Regions:
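An acidic/histidine-cluster motif and surrounding catalytic segment
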Residues: 1-91, 101-128
C-alpha cells in the first residue's frame, strides 16, 4: 500500500470532481499487483492484457461512486519509462480513474488526448 496523504488526496479528488459537476460519494481504490489486475481484466472485462487501471463505475446522478483497481507494478514501470516519480505516476492513475467516473473516455485518439489534457490540469493542482 503506498503512503499517501489521504486528506490532501481526498480534497484534491473532490475539487477535480466538482470541476465536472460531481460530488464524491464512495470511491474505493484497490492497489494490487499486475497479476491481480490481469485476473480482474479477464474476469470482468474479457480482456487478456495487463493494464494500469480498471474503473468500475457505480455513480448515480451527480455523485461519483466506483471501484478503481490500480496495478502498482505497472505504475512503477510506467513511472520509470516516462521519467516520473512513483508518486507522480500514481496520482496520474488515481485521477485517471476518477475522470473515467465523470464520463471521460480514452478509447479513441481524440478522447485519449482529452484524458491526458484533463490529467495534466488536475495534476497541476496537486504538487507531488
Amino acid at each position: 500500500m503506498p503512503a499517501l496523504d489521504e486528506r490532501k488526496v481526498g480534497k484534491w479528488i473532490r475539487a477535480v470532481a466538482a470541476e465536472y459537476g460531481f460530488a464524491v460519494g464512495n470511491i474505493n481504490y484497490i492497489f494490487c499487483s499486475d497479476e491481480r489486475e490481469l485476473a480482474v481484466n479477464r474476469e470482468f472485462l474479457g480482456h487478456d492484457y495487463y493494464t494500469d487501471v480498471i474503473t468500475f463505475d457505480y455513480s448515480t446522478a451527480q455523485t461519483l461512486n466506483g471501484d478503481i483497481f490500480i496495478s502498482l507494478d505497472t505504475v512503477r514501470s510506467n513511472a520509470e519509462m516516462v521519467g516520473a516519480t512513483f508518486e507522480q505516476e500514481l496520482m496520474r492513475i488515481v485521477i485517471h480513474g476518477v475522470l473515467h467516473l465523470t464520463g471521460q473516455g480514452d478509447k479513441s485518439p481524440e478522447t485519449k488526448a482529452e484524458m491526458t489534457e484533463k490529467e495534466e490540469r488536475a495534476l497541476d493542482k496537486l504538487k507531488v
